[in-house]
């Protein structure tokens, strides 16, 4: 990366010429100071080697892979008086996934569901030995306590990816999971997932583009129906919530602002079994009835093949579409699959204290991890509440280890870790459109408990998630967006 090498050369020159450094303007000085602290220690022969192993008189370093619910909760609670924190992730923000579907149709703006890492853990922006790196971890050297990284340069054609290494005292793998495609041909090429902000942006742009294209003179009736047929594959909470938001958008906004094509737009939800299979039976029936009333067509079937303009089901049915959203759950990522460590149903195998027992000083939390069979515990579902609770527990455990002098590499073997992690399910919620939602407060599918449906549940759903939004800034954004949508309708700008 030529520009990066040149900066390192400049930094060396500035370091050697103290008088020149003192003449730098006060505005530029703090930025160069932080850059010098990185390059002066870790540059060799014009190549950035990375962050070297910490010394005994330095704070131990925790490296967190990922910026999802698990990793961000851990970084928020970790004691930065004990540890230096380094986060490596291909995105510089956490996505508040429960509200992501609302951004696809303009109910909320994208910034309302994105929380910058520097706001969650200010140390990565302010402390000299804590960093956030916009990069992917390609490999882990467990024996030498080191990870191999490569910078993310998506959309920047002029920059080459830069490889560097980071040594760790404690490593937390919280890299999440990838969308399951079940090996179905054409899914990755033609479907849109709903896990990241850029996915929601893509859905919104394509939806609005199809609405505008269908209104162009000369477009056939058949093509209008195809362009405005929105297909959602997967009847879990994400698929159902997106279908509900989309039906609301059609009934309230499309009918007003795209009156010429309002009779052509439809939503189809395809699921192999029952929708919302983890919810109470009564709530599933209620959701089915409400979605049907909202105009959502429910189809039970298996997708066999995805083509650019249509889906082929296992029974041979051909389903044309203009927008295809794929939401069939998650599975192990290629990175997790590449790690040579014991697995639990494809996930990284962990013990009761969230450690990876086959290697020293490595922990794993969130969707990428699962309890080993030897623990006698079931693999937990890939839910935000599971990931967040694991992050909170592990931060407390690592703070305890650090206070007892076990923060550095290979120093925690004889420390009492206390009680193991225990997960208690707090219930499930899902919105289904038309100011209605489901609230299932049972601890498990077989247990008894309170279940609610309707407008009261919608109020509970909004209140609960509003309190979970990380910062006051985003809480205010969400409230303003909800109020604006209620009074003026959704934003239909295609930006």
Swiss-Prot record:
Which cofactor(s) are needed, names only? FAD
> How is the cofactor bound, as the UniProt entry phrases it?
Binds 1 FAD per subunit.
The positions annotated for binding NAD(+) are 228-264
Q: Does the keyword DNA repair apply?
A: no
What this protein catalyses is: a quinone + NADH + H(+) = a quinol + NAD(+); a ubiquinone + NADH + H(+) = a ubiquinol + NAD(+)
Give the EC number(s) under which this enzyme is classified.
Answer: 1.6.5.9
What is one term from the GO cellular component aspect held by the record?
A: mitochondrial matrix
Q: Where in the cell is it found?
A: Mitochondrion inner membrane; Peroxisome
Q: Where is the transit peptide?
A: 1-41
The short sequence motif called Microbody targeting signal sits at 486-495
**Residues the entry annotates as binding FAD:** 61-91
One Pfam family name is: Pyr_redox_2
- Give the keywords, sorted: FAD, Flavoprotein, Membrane, Mitochondrion, Mitochondrion inner membrane, NAD, NADP, Oxidoreductase, Peroxisome, Transit peptide
Entry superkingdom: Eukaryota
Q: Which InterPro entries match?
A: FAD/NAD-bd_sf, FAD/NAD-binding_dom, NDH-2, NDH2-like_C
Gene Ontology terms, MF aspect:
NADH:ubiquinone reductase (non-electrogenic) activity; NADPH dehydrogenase activity; oxidoreductase activity
How does the protein's chain sit in the membrane according to the entry? Peripheral membrane protein
Instruction: Indicate the secretion signal residues.
Output: none
Q: Which PANTHER family match?
A: NADH DEHYDROGENASE, NADH DEHYDROGENASE-RELATED
Please explain the role this protein plays, according to its UniProt record.
Answer: Alternative NADH-ubiquinone oxidoreductase which catalyzes the oxidation of mitochondrial NADH does not translocate protons across the inner mitochondrial membrane.
Which family does the record claim for this protein?
A: Belongs to the NADH dehydrogenase family.
| The name this protein goes by in its record | Internal alternative NAD(P)H-ubiquinone oxidoreductase A1, mitochondrial
Report the source organism: Solanum tuberosum
């Amino acid at each position: 990366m030529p520009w990066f090498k040149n900066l390192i050369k400049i930094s060396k020159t500035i370091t050697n010429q103290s008088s020149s450094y003192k003449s730098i303007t006060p505005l530029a000085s703090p930025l160069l100071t932080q850059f010098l602290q990185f390059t002066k220690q870790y540059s060799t022969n014009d190549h950035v080697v990375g962050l070297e192993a910490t010394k005994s008189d330095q704070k131990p370093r925790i490296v967190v892979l990922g910026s999802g619910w698990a990793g961000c909760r851990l970084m928020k609670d970790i004691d930065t008086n004990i540890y230096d924190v380094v986060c490596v992730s291909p995105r510089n923000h956490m996505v508040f996934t429960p509200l992501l579907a609302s951004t696809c149709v303009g109910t909320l703006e994208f910034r309302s569901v994105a929380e910058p890492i520097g706001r969650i853990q200010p140390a990565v922006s302010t402390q000299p030995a804590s960093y956030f790196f916009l990069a992917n971890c390609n490999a882990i050297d467990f024996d030498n306590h080191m990870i191999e990284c490569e910078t993310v340069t998506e959309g920047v054609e002029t920059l080459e990816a830069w490889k560097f290494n980071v040594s760790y005292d404690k490593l937390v793998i919280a890299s999440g999971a990838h969308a399951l495609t079940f090996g179905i041909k054409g899914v990755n090429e033609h479907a849109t997932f709903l896990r990241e902000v850029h996915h929601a942006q893509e859905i919104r742009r394509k939806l609005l583009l199809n609405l505008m294209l269908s209104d162009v003179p000369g477009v056939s009736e058949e093509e209008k129906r195809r362009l405005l047929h929105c297909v959602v594959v997967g009847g879990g909470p994400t698929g159902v919530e997106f279908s509900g938001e989309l039906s609301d958008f059609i009934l309230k906004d499309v009918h007003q602002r795209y009156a010429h094509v309002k009779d052509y737009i439809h939503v189809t939800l395809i699921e192999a079994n029952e929708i919302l299979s983890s919810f109470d039976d009564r709530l599933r029936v209620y959701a089915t009835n409400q979605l049907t009333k909202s105009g959502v067509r429910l189809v039970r079937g298996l997708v066999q093949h995805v083509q650019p303009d249509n889906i082929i089901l296992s029974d041979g049915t051909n389903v044309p579409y203009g927008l295809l959203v794929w939401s069939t759950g998650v599975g192990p990522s290629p990175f997790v699959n590449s790690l040579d460590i014991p697995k639990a149903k494809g996930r990284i195998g962990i013990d009761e204290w969230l450690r990876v027992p086959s290697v020293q000083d490595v922990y794993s939390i969130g969707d990428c991890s699962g309890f080993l069979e030897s623990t006698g515990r079931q693999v937990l579902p890939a839910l935000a509440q599971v990931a967040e609770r694991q992050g909170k527990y592990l931060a407390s455990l690592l703070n305890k280890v650090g206070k007892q002098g076990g923060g550095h590499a290979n120093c925690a073997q004889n420390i009492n870790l206390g009680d193991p992690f225990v997960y208690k399910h707090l219930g499930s919620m899902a919105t289904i459109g038309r100011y209605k939602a489901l609230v299932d407060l049972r601890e498990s599918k077989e247990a008894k408990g309170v279940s609610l449906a309707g407008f009261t549940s919608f109020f509970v759903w909004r209140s609960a998630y509003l309190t979970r939004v990380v910062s006051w800034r985003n809480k205010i954004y969400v409230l303003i967006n909800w109020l604006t949508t209620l009074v003026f309708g959704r934003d239909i700008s295609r930006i």
